[in-house]
Amino acid sequence: MKKKEKPKYSAVSNIIYALKNEWRWAKDKILFDLPRYPIELFTMLAGMYFPKLIIDAITMGQTAWYIAVLVVGYYLILLALRIVSGYTSNRRFRYHYYVPMKYQNRLTMRRFTTDFQNTDDPDINLKYNKADSDASTTSGAANNMYTTLAGIISSILGMASCAAIITVISPWILVTVIIEAAIYYLFSCANMKYARDHADENADVNRRKGYIAGFSSNFEYAKDIKIYGMRGWIDDMFKQFQSESLRLYKNEQTRWCAQRVTGVLLYTVRHGISYLFLTAMLFDGKITPGDFVFMLSAVGNLATDLSRISWSFNTLYDYSRRMGWYREYFDIPERFNHGEGEPIPTRANMPMDIEFKDVSFKYPSADGEKYALKHVNLKIKAGEKLAIVGRNGAGKTTLVKLLCGLYYPSEGGIFLGGTDIEKFNVDEYYSLISAVFQDINIIPLTIAQFVAATDIDEDVDRGRAMKCLELAGLGDKIKELEKGMDSRLMKGIYDDSIDLSGGEKQKLMLARALYKNAGIVVLDEPTAALDPIAENELYLKYNMLTKGTTSPYISHRLASTRFCDRIFYIEDGEIAECGTHDELMAMNGKYAYMYGLQSRYYSENVNVREAEA
């Protein structure tokens, strides 16, 4: 288990932070909460004192009319207070979900806008998951920190009033109640500490359980689950995480159960002692029957307020820790510029030279000194078509993500037209790049909207979108569809949606990259899901599709590299060989060896098919 880190922010700091946000986002909630304190205090004291008045009136032989006036007057006052309380409570409740929604919206927007590398860091993801789990529930700190603090203020007022009343009659009863509350508070502290110490473990188990649940319900995996009989494995994995979750829950609840049992025993002892003291005083004539009821009620309310205060302070401390999660996630540093930076080159000035200077990169989760890329030096000339090849895990995709501004170098720098890309506004820098990555992610838009990367039809240049679809090889498919480019994507979201094949999805991604008309076009295995005919068509059109751009091209099929100006062969995170196809073949090195293996494999396959025919 990881060594627990000390919280970055103190409880007081987090409380002040939460109150400032509450005032900024829901000022009316606080203003309408102010009448609550005098109303609750008066209602409690009146509820204690009114029975004494009635009992004393009866024992003193007052008339029924006098008693009736007392009862009616009391309930009229109570009714008026409850009307005011109900009105202010309803006004407060309007903001019940507003504040946590503000926290969650800000959290989500930060998730969208933070450096991409931050979303790929397990430690940062844990911070986000913890903060999001609190902001997304009405029982978290985001929704209840102010409410808990307000409850403490109300309970302190009640406690002070009851303590003053009890002290006048018998200080020993007050001491008994305080001792009982202190013992209960210690139990509560121990249980809260246990919950805090196991919060990360709980979050990790719930994350794993949630992943398995999401995986099993994802339509994309349904075929694999059925064909490969994965149901049993998924069921076993879910049960394993469920069992671990239940174990943690049982351990926590066992402690709370012990606290509740202790609370009942303490309540019994406290009530017994109070009854003995007050009964003795009643028989000695020191108090009246009305005083007896009044004092017993005061003891009960004092114990309740002390219990609430102790519980609320522990809860407030826990909420403070949770608020710290939120603040710590927002404190994660951004290395790239967001919303500021040097002006980016205009499209008219593109393409431009791109240079990697002694670039090394290590993933945040990597152990020790394990680098994905080591001391990479390369210069991509303006308008050059560059192939990046190598075995799986060599570092090809990592290099491309660095170029795209998704990752930043651990060492060295990347320069566009002589300017370090970290000096640009990264969001503007992204506008210079079109990319087709290995991962295909479709979102529920129309085909036209998806290609134009917008959900507003008026922003779509339909002629341009159709041209890009045709260039990508989807023209005939679009013409076959009843709604053409207005067909919705992703079945399961809309009833009239369509599903595309793997190859068609890859063509759609290519069409989107072409529509953007950026100065840098990154193609990461753009033919992986295409059939041989479609793949060959793409090769033939490659120069036309990337005309006027700088285009890094990643491929496992080395035959495709003939269309590129230069080839970089990467091995173990380093550039092992560099040159044109003919130059690398003449070197008879690693590239030539791999090319020979692939050529022999494809040649043997062709011969086998011809023999079978």
Predicted stretch roles:
Residues 1-43, 64, 88, 92, ...:
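Membrane-integrated ABC transporters
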Residues 230, 273-274, 295-332:
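Cytosolic ends of transmembrane helices, especially the final helix of ABC transmembrane type-1 domains
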Residues 128, 370-371, 409, 415, ...:
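ABC-fold ATPase nucleotide-binding domain signature/coupling loops
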Residues 404:
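Helix-to-loop junction immediately C-terminal to a conserved catalytic motif
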Residues 30-84, 162-195, 273-276, 280, ...:
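Transmembrane helix-loop-helix hairpins at lipid-water interfaces of multipass membrane proteins
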Residues 415, 430, 448-495, 539-540, ...:
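ABC ATPase nucleotide-binding domain helical subdomain, centered on the C-loop/LSGGQ "ABC signature"
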Residues 484, 540, 548, 556-557, ...:
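C-terminal portion of ABC ATPase nucleotide-binding domains
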